[in-house]
């Protein structure tokens, strides 16, 4: 079961990825984690990646694809894997296809931008413990205070409105075109494509994913 999750930041992919991993026993492959692990392990690809990153440059698609191939050849990917955050662009999707990396399911999480902004900018974090609240959906007992310690809550830089809007613009420019790319792939019989309404309750989305994935 090889799965790609598509959707803007804040669309709920992370929450459902945890569920899919637990339910189907497949690992989530994050290219960021993979790069860090390869650099730490000092593999040939890791050394190449380190050299590029140390020079302040972006790692090439070719190198990332090579790392993905290396990663999915490991034992824990025998039953499949879950890709989140990759591919981000059509050239990356093409490179994956050229490298013979097949995908069984592509699942798009559809959520309107304004709801995503609402979801993200309302987050409040207790930095020391990692506890996360939301001013509307999961408020602390006392405004802007952690329930357990009473300490102040903060807003992460990534959760500030201007940052969120920039990330959404980037998503629509680069990643949203993958929706039609994978719809065409599904029409050609190369994968199965599903659109999930991410505006619903977590449990409802989870139930739909179980129906899709079996």
From Swiss-Prot:
Record-listed ATP binding positions: 10-15, 123, 132-133, 200
Family annotation (Gene3D superfamilies): P-loop containing nucleotide triphosphate hydrolases
GO molecular-function terms, A-Z: adenylate kinase activity; ATP binding
GO cellular component: cytoplasm
Annotated SUPFAM superfamilies: P-loop containing nucleoside triphosphate hydrolases (SSF52540)
Keyword Transferase: yes
Pfam families reported in the protein's UniProt record: ADK, ADK_lid
One of the protein's GO biological processes: AMP salvage
Pathway assigned in UniProt: Purine metabolism; AMP biosynthesis via salvage pathway; AMP from ADP: step 1/1
Region (NMP): 30-59
Segments for region (LID): 122-159
Subunit annotation: Monomer.
The family this protein is said to belong to: Belongs to the adenylate kinase family.
Its biological purpose: Catalyzes the reversible transfer of the terminal phosphate group between ATP and AMP. Plays an important role in cellular energy homeostasis and in adenine nucleotide metabolism.
Protein name: Adenylate kinase
Taxonomy of the source species: Bacteria, Pseudomonadati, Pseudomonadota, Gammaproteobacteria, Enterobacterales
